[in-house]
């Protein structure tokens, strides 16, 4: 692996707003009477979240699909790219750790539901009943009814993505990640996307630049962008803060 020096960090934060109900599956409530067949994922304290791994994995998969950067394993499975040298591998890391040539750039935090005042997480849940139809009879197949727990449309999650900066060219890697976020807005997050689940929008987005001098005690070296409502506005905000990092 190339020996690179950390120049700073760029933090991307904002809100993920659900435009349709979303289901990211959790552990089945097998011991609960009346528990749903397919609950949404929660942490150990019962809080509803979008796992960072789900957000990161979806954005990576969309970028790989767009660029044709995936491999077939001979058994009909399509695996993540792992050359270790392209933009996608630099951002997310290669699939095979033996091919790591540079430090992985991105950290994607878990995104937690942000309830409004006087509301609890469970106020943002709904049960959607789905069924499987007999193609000849036009009726529900026996055993074909299932209950899906969803986080309701309009729910908001606070997200944070951290980019470790080593080179001046890492600016292009941040732009590449933002490209993946744009693809996600026109795709879906979680399961059952073809049934209309998981349409999302990124809102209230801003960038925070913390050069290495910030971590050495110079708090005034931190720069923040304006908060924007669209990913299309984010690239110009990146240009404004990028000068805060010293690459000499």
UniProtKB/Swiss-Prot annotation:
Transmembrane segments: none annotated. One of its GO terms (molecular function) is metal ion binding. CRISPR (clustered regularly interspaced short palindromic repeat) is an adaptive immune system that provides protection against mobile genetic elements (viruses, transposable elements and conjugative plasmids). CRISPR clusters contain spacers, sequences complementary to antecedent mobile elements, and target invading nucleic acids. CRISPR clusters are transcribed and processed into CRISPR RNA (crRNA). CDD domains: Csm3_III-A. Keywords: Antiviral defense, Endonuclease, Hydrolase, Metal-binding, Nuclease, RNA-binding, Zinc. Encoded in a type III-A CRISPR locus. The keyword Nucleus does not apply. GO terms for biological process: defense response to virus. Pfam families: RAMPs (PF03787). It is an enzyme of class 3 (hydrolase). This is CRISPR system Cms endoribonuclease Csm3. It comes from the Archaea. The gene is csm3. PANTHER family: CRISPR SYSTEM CMS ENDORIBONUCLEASE CSM3. Belongs to the CRISPR-associated Csm3 family. The keyword Secreted does not apply. It comes from Methanocaldococcus jannaschii (strain ATCC 43067 / DSM 2661 / JAL-1 / JCM 10045 / NBRC 100440). Zn(2+) binds at residues 81, 83, 89. Its EC number is 3.1.-.-. Part of the Csm effector complex that includes Cas10, Csm2, Csm3, Csm4 and Csm5. Stable Csm3-Csm4 (which crystallizes as 2 heterodimers) and Cas10-Csm1-Csm3-Csm4 subcomplexes can be isolated; Cas10 and Csm3 probably do not directly interact.
């Amino acid at each position: 692996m190339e020996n690179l020096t950390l120049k700073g960090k760029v933090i991307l934060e904002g809100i993920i707003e659900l435009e349709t109900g979303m289901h990211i599956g959790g552990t089945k409530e097998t011991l609960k009477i009346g528990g749903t067949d397919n609950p949404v994922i929660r942490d150990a304290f019962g809080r509803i979240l979008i796992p960072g791994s789900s957000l990161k994995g979806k954005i990576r998969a969309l970028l790989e699909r767009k660029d044709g950067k995936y491999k077939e394993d001979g058994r009909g499975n399509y695996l993540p790219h792992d050359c270790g040298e392209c933009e996608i591998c630099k951002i997310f890391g290669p699939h095979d750790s033996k091919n790591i040539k540079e430090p992985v750039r991105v950290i994607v935090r878990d995104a937690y539901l942000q309830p409004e005042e006087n509301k609890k997480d469970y106020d943002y849940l709904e049960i959607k009943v789905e069924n499987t139809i007999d193609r000849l009879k036009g009726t529900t197949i026996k055993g074909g009814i299932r209950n899906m727990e969803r986080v309701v449309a309009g729910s908001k999650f606070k997200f944070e993505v951290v980019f470790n900066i080593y080179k001046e060219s890492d600016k292009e890697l941040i732009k590449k990640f933002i490209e993946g976020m744009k693809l996600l807005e026109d795709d879906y997050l979680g399961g059952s996307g073809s049934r209309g689940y998981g349409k999302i929008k990124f809102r209230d987005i801003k960038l925070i630049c913390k050069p290495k001098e910030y971590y050495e005690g110079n708090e005034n070296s931190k720069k923040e962008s304006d908060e924007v409502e669209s990913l299309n506005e984010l690239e110009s905000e990146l240009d404004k803060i990028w000068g805060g990092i010293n690459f000499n």
